[in-house]
C-alpha cells in the first residue's frame, strides 16, 4: 500500500527516490527499533516516510536535508507529532560531533541515502564513528553487498575493509524498486552498521591503514608486493605475517590492520 504525505516531485539532481510502500516503511521502523529519547539523525528525510513514524516514537529528531523545497511541507507534517529540527545542508559538510554534544549522547543515524553519493557519505560518517551508536541505511543493493562482502568475494574491496574495520555490518533485507516513487532501476537493501568498541580496533595510524587499503585495491589484480611497493617494505610483510605474493581480496580485515601496524625493522 502506498503512503504519501505530500507530492513534491523527486529531483534527479539529488538522486531522489521516495519510499512510499507502507509495508517496507513498517519493516524499516521495526528494524531501527526507535526508543523514547533516542538521539536520531536522519540523512535525507525526503517526504517523511521514515521521519514521522520515528518522530512518534522518539518525540524529537534531527534531519539533514539539502532540497529546500522539502523543508516547509515536512516541517508542517511534523509539527503536530513532535520536535523536528531540519538542517538545510549537504551532509558531507555537517560535523556530527556537534549534534552529539548538543544531545549529550551518541547518535543513531538513519537514512535513505542518495545512490549517487552513498559512498562519500559512508566514509564521512565513518570518520565520526566514535560518537555514533548505530546506523541504519537504505542503499543500492550492490553497495550493501560490497559493504558486507567477505574476503575472496568478487565484490570485496576498499569499502568492505574500511567499514568492517570500524563497524559490524549486517544486511537486513531487500527493498524492491516498486516500493519507491519514482522507482529506481535496481534493488535497494537495508544495512545496519554498529561501530566497534574503539579499544578493540587497535589501528595505530588510521591514515596509513587507509592508504594501504586504497593502494591495495586500486590495483587489485597485482600482488601486494607490487601494489604496495611505495608503502610497505618486505620487513612490513614479514612482521605482519603476510605473503608478498598475496592479492588484496585474499586478506582479512585483521590482516590489513596488522600490515598497517607492522614495523619497518
UniProtKB/Swiss-Prot annotation:
It is an enzyme of class 2 (transferase). S-adenosyl-L-methionine binds at residues 17, 19, 44, 65, 90, 112. One of its GO terms (molecular function) is 16S rRNA (adenine(1518)-N(6)/adenine(1519)-N(6))-dimethyltransferase activity. The keyword Cytoplasm applies. It holds the Pfam family RrnaAD. Its EC number is 2.1.1.182. Transmembrane segments: none annotated. InterPro entries: KsgA/Erm, rRNA_Ade_diMease-like_C, rRNA_Ade_Mease_Trfase_CS, rRNA_Ade_methylase_Trfase_N, rRNA_adenine_dimethylase, SAM-dependent_MTases_sf. It is found in: Cytoplasm. GO terms for cellular component: cytosol. It catalyses: adenosine(1518)/adenosine(1519) in 16S rRNA + 4 S-adenosyl-L-methionine = N(6)-dimethyladenosine(1518)/N(6)-dimethyladenosine(1519) in 16S rRNA + 4 S-adenosyl-L-homocysteine + 4 H(+). Keywords: Cytoplasm, Methyltransferase, RNA-binding, rRNA processing, S-adenosyl-L-methionine, Transferase. Its main location: cytoplasm. Coiled coil: none annotated. SMART domains: rADc (SM00650). Specifically dimethylates two adjacent adenosines (A1518 and A1519) in the loop of a conserved hairpin near the 3'-end of 16S rRNA in the 30S particle. May play a critical role in biogenesis of 30S subunits. Belongs to the class I-like SAM-binding methyltransferase superfamily. rRNA adenine N(6)-methyltransferase family. RsmA subfamily. This is Ribosomal RNA small subunit methyltransferase A. It comes from Xylella fastidiosa (strain Temecula1 / ATCC 700964).
Amino acid at each position: 500500500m502506498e503512503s504519501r504525505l505530500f507530492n513534491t516531485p523527486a529531483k534527479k539532481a539529488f538522486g531522489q527516490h521516495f519510499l512510499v510502500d507502507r509495508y517496507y516503511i513498517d519493516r524499516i521502523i521495526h528494524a531501527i527499533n526507535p526508543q523514547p529519547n533516542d538521539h536520531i539523525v536522519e540523512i535525507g528525510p525526503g517526504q517523511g516516510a521514515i521521519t514521522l513514524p520515528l518522530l512518534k516514537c522518539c518525540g524529537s529528531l534531527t534531519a539533514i536535508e539539502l532540497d529546500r523545497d522539502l523543508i516547509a511541507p515536512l516541517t508542517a507534517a511534523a509539527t503536530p507529532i513532535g520536535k523536528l529540527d531540519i538542517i538545510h545542508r549537504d551532509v558531507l559538510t555537517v560535523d556530527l560531533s556537534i549534534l552529539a554534544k548538543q544531545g549529550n549522547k551518541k547518535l543513531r543515524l538513519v537514512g535513505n541515502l542518495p545512490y549517487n553519493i552513498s559512498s562519500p557519505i559512508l566514509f564521512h560518517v565513518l570518520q565520526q564513528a566514535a560518537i555514533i551508536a548505530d546506523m541504519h541505511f537504505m542503499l543500492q543493493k550492490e553497495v550493501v553487498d560490497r559493504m558486507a562482502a567477505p574476503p575472496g568475494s568478487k565484490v570485496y574491496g576498499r569499502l568492505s575493509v574500511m567499514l568492517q574495520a570500524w563497524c559490524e555490518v549486517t544486511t537486513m533485507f531487500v527493498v524492491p524498486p516498486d516500493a519507491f516513487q519514482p522507482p529506481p532501476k535496481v534493488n535497494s537493501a537495508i544495512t545496519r552498521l554498529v561501530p566497534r568498541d574503539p579499544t578493540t580496533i587497535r589501528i595505530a595510524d588510521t591514515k596509513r591503514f587507509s592508504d594501504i587499503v586504497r593502494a591495495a585495491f586500486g590495483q587489485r589484480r597485482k600482488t601486494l608486493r607490487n601494489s604496495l611497493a611505495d608503502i610497505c617494505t618486505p620487513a612490513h610483510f614479514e612482521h605482519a605475517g603476510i605473503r608478498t605474493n598475496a592479492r588484496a581480496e585474499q586478506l582479512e580485515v585483521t590482516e590489513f590492520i596488522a600490515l598497517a601496524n607492522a614495523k619497518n625493522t
